[in-house]
Amino acid sequence: MECLRSLPCLLPRAMRLPRRTLCALALDLTSVARPVAACGRAANLVGRSRAAQLCGPGRLRVAGEVHRLRTSDVSQATLASVAPVFTVTKFDKQGNVTSFEKKKTELYQELGLQARDLRFQHVMSITVRNNRIIMRMEYLKAVITPECLLILDYRNLNLEQWLFRELPSQLSGEGQLVTYPLPFEFRAIEALLQYWINTLQGKLSILQPLILETLDALVDPKHSSVDRSKLHILLQNGKSLSELETDIKIFKESILEILDEEELLEELCLSKWSDPQVFEKSSAGIDHAEEMELLLENYYRLADDLSNAARELRVLIDDSQSIIFINLDSHRNVMMRLNLQLTMGTFSLSLFGLMGVAFGMNLESSLEEDHRIFWLIIGIMFMGSGLIWRRLLSFLGRQLEAPLPPMV
């Protein structure tokens, strides 16, 4: 009896199946065994063979597969429930704007992308996946299709003015974009590149006057000492300038990587491969790949100009730093020379001060009785000290004179 009682607990462990699956198999066996019991011993044997088939490895394997499928469905449903939600802003060819929220899984399935394509990265990149252009510009992420432009998660980025005032007019052709006669993806790429170039230009226009003002205050010859607060401000501005130079460098490298690969230029022309009419126009006269190359080269030159301006500021900072070091060395040399002069004066005075020490000893002489001898000794001490000090100063001056340049 005890063995029968422990059988429900031991059977799932022995079969390595969940209890629910065993219960389902037991119900199938009982439904088959009931008609078998009414047909005698032969029917009983047939029922046993049928039960053996139901409990065989094939039947158990099917049950395990069903259980795994149910588990995978549950896990997928759980992942879908916790998937991040994107705030998507959609711009069409006419400049119409619509905003909506969509889960990440639904979004990349709808666009035909992979989950890794929608990951946020702070490094700028331009990639093409499944006839979709994915542009990452630090905090800005955009997906360009032949029909629309999608901006993902623009909140808390201070982009409202550009998104809802400037970008729709640029995409609809009312702005000052040079790619208006070309397909939609050209206007979208140019609008995003123009925004990023303007952002970098704005950072440079803020840093440039601050750096120049600080440098003028530091290298001013009227000030004999260096203001530490100005040096601290210059250090902070130098760090900001280094970050700006890094951003410009990454921007140039991203564009240059595309310009070096003709296949990437062809892939950026989305409408060429999705619209037969555009493909015929591109094959007949207007080469969209060349237009894309000209567009990227234009913004590469603009980024190169920004890089040169930032490099000039860096050179000014380095030159000013050299001037500051020279001034500090000059002040240090003056202080060292003054210290040396005072040391030589002290030595001269101490040397002739030995005469006074001789009179301070307990020696008998008749000179102490004459008051004129006191002033005579004092005069000799100061005169001798002055002569020796002057001699030492002339020697120091000869030693510190700059050597003459060699004759050519």
From Swiss-Prot:
Topology of the protein relative to the lipid bilayer: Multi-pass membrane protein
Residues reported in the UniProt entry to bind Mg(2+) 1: 243, 246-247, 312
GO molecular function, one term: magnesium ion transmembrane transporter activity
Keywords assigned by UniProt, alphabetized: Ion transport, Magnesium, Membrane, Metal-binding, Mitochondrion, Mitochondrion inner membrane, Transit peptide, Transmembrane, Transmembrane helix, Transport
Annotated GO CC locations: mitochondrial inner membrane; mitochondrion
Ion transport keyword on record: yes
Ranges that cross the membrane: 340-359, 371-401
UniProt cross-references to Gene3D superfamilies, sorted A to Z: 2.40.128.330, Magnesium transport protein CorA, transmembrane region
Top-level taxon of the source organism: Eukaryota
Ranges per topology, Mitochondrial intermembrane: 360-370
Location in the cell: Mitochondrion inner membrane
Transit peptide, start-end: 1-62
Residues that hold Mg(2+) 3 according to the record: 360, 362
Chief localisation class: mitochondrion
GO biological process: mitochondrial magnesium ion transmembrane transport
Segments in the Mitochondrial matrix topological domain: 63-339, 402-408
Cited Pfam families: MRS2-like
Regulation of activity: May be regulated by calcium ions.
UniProt: Mg(2+) 2 binding residues: 329
Comment block on domains: The GMN motif acts as an ion selectivity filter.
Oligomeric and partner information: Homopentamer.
Role summary: Magnesium transporter that mediates the influx of magnesium into the mitochondrial matrix and regulates magnesium metabolism. Also permeable to calcium, sodium and potassium ions. Required for normal expression of the mitochondrial respiratory complex I subunits. May play a role in maintaining the inner mitochondrial membrane potential.
Similarity comment: family membership: Belongs to the CorA metal ion transporter (MIT) (TC 1.A.35) family.
Designated name of the protein: Magnesium transporter MRS2 homolog, mitochondrial
Species name: Macaca fascicularis
Gene that this polypeptide is encoded by: MRS2
